[in-house]
Amino acid sequence: MAKKGKKYLEAAKAVDPTKQYTPEEAVDLLKKIDFAKFDETVEVAYRLNVDPKQADQQIRGAVVLPNGTGKTAKVIVFAQGDQAKAAEDAGADIVGAEDLVQKIQDGWLDFDVAVATPPMMAQVGRLGRVLGPKGLMPNPKTGTVTMDTAKAVKDIKAGQVAYRVDKAGIIHAPIGKKSFDADKLLENFKAMNDIVLKARPASTKGIYIKSLALTATMAPGIKVNPSDF
């Protein structure tokens, strides 16, 4: 494990590890922990009472944050005909079909999100071994396999965040930048929290959110009380 720096350790002293903060307190505290020399990404981590090995508990989806993420994603679209033109008009960075599949097979991966129309998935499926492990494979659950390529591109450019529960039952998701006003971070936090709550599997019994933390790239985790939303 990497050794924590002196500034990080000093910042950690401001956080009470035994306390569950309200969302407002957590955001205010996080913004006060400011020693990084860049605009840090703010993230949330939900530890859920789910078993990702069960098909009905593999939580995955996407949400458009009301205030965006602070980053404009580079979007590629696998489409032809009208859907290709619609994607271009909506602001897609690169649109292609077989040529784009080949480009990725040749090693090009300079993009953040991939969208595909259903008819293109037979060809895009060949990229599974490359895109799958990187979380870049188009998927209907995240709205990235669709005939409405224009909406998909616009949503992603507007700050759509894809999320999925990992093998440990945790969802990690960005909700903005440290430079955001506190109220904007809170609005994004609430939007993410709402979507996680709506994704609760019917088969989950008892407590759903086991723990929740707010953090940033160079900041310690701050425990948040899920009941305070």
Curated annotation (Swiss-Prot):
The record's section on InterPro entries has: Ribosom_uL1_bac-type, Ribosomal_uL1, Ribosomal_uL1-like, Ribosomal_uL1/biogenesis, Ribosomal_uL1_3-a/b-sand, Ribosomal_uL1_CS
Name its GO BP terms in alphabetical order: regulation of translation; translation
Q: Which keywords, in A-to-Z order, does the entry hold?
A: Repressor, Ribonucleoprotein, Ribosomal protein, RNA-binding, rRNA-binding, Translation regulation, tRNA-binding
What Pfam family is a match for this entry?
Ribosomal_L1
Organism's domain of life? Bacteria
List, alphabetically, the GO terms of the cellular component aspect.
Answer: large ribosomal subunit
Q: Which family does the record claim for this protein?
A: Belongs to the universal ribosomal protein uL1 family.
PROSITE patterns according to UniProt = RIBOSOMAL_L1
Subunit structure comment from the entry: Part of the 50S ribosomal subunit.
What does the protein in this record do? Binds directly to 23S rRNA. The L1 stalk is quite mobile in the ribosome, and is involved in E site tRNA release. Protein L1 is also a translational repressor protein, it controls the translation of the L11 operon by binding to its mRNA.
Q: Which GO terms describe its molecular function?
A: rRNA binding; structural constituent of ribosome; tRNA binding
User: By what name is this protein known?
Assistant: Large ribosomal subunit protein uL1
